Regions:
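FIC/Doc superfamily catalytic core
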Residues: 1-218
Length: 218
């Protein structure tokens, strides 16, 4: 997917949904309308009842996503330095060791992590990206923020390979957690394929600004 060709409305739509659902998978209670207010206007409705931490968990997605987009536009490969940058953005004002791999007995856990190797077909590429996500979450290289970071860098790889973004909705949390726990990459592929097909339709609807189709997809 060429980010430059995306409309601003669809770019913001991806960002809002990614922030809402990715944070929601970790227990964030901020609603989708409140997420729109945070991402677009930088304000949190007083009626939301959200904590300061929840606000930053949402707001930090904006700087992380925009950094990711900048790297992708420059056609930069996903190196460990970029992963650390994205983690630092997502955990800004939330943890003291942002952007740093955790250490146990002087061993850097993140050193075990490697990004997906090149693959030939689209299915091979998608399978490799999903498997890398499973392994990233298994390793848990950071002290906190692994879920949000893992999903962001998974989308980095997907967008770089021409796929739509994979936004895992918080309503699918039980299935998603099960897929990670069992490391069932084939079932994850089936789950992701259906979700990506839906996202492709949403992208097309945004390009034609067909509001009725957008509502149907939702």
């Amino acid at each position: 997917m060429n980010l430059i060709s995306l409309t601003r409305d669809y770019f913001d739509d991806i960002l809002v949904r990614l922030a809402h659902h990715s944070a929601g998978l970790e227990g964030n209670s901020i609603s989708l309308p409140a997420t729109v207010s945070i991402i677009v206007n930088g304000t949190l409705p007083t009626s939301s009842g959200a904590t300061v931490r929840e606000f930053y968990e949402i707001e930090n997605h904006k700087q992380a996503f925009e950094r990711m987009a900048s790297h992708l536009i420059n056609e930069e490969l996903l190196f460990v330095t970029i992963i650390k940058e994205i983690h630092a953005d997502l955990t800004d004002r939330l943890q003291y060791d942002k952007g740093q791999f955790k250490k146990i007995k002087n061993i850097i856990i993140g050193a075990e992590f490697q990004t997906a190797s090149p693959a030939e077909t689209s299915d091979d590429k998608l399978l490799a990206i999903l498997d890398t996500h499973i392994q990233f979450e298994r390793i848990h290289p950071f002290s906190d923020g692994n879920g949000r970071t893992g999903r962001m860098i998974m989308n980095y790889s997907l967008l770089q390979e021409g796929f739509p973004p994979l936004i895992i909705e918080k309503e699918a949390k039980a299935q998603y957690v099960e897929l990670l726990a069992t490391q069932d990459v084939d079932s994850f592929l089936s789950f992701a394929t259906k979700t990506l097909e839906k996202e492709s339709k949403r992208m097309i609807a945004f390009q034609s600004m067909d509001q009725e189709k957008i509502k149907e997809i939702e």
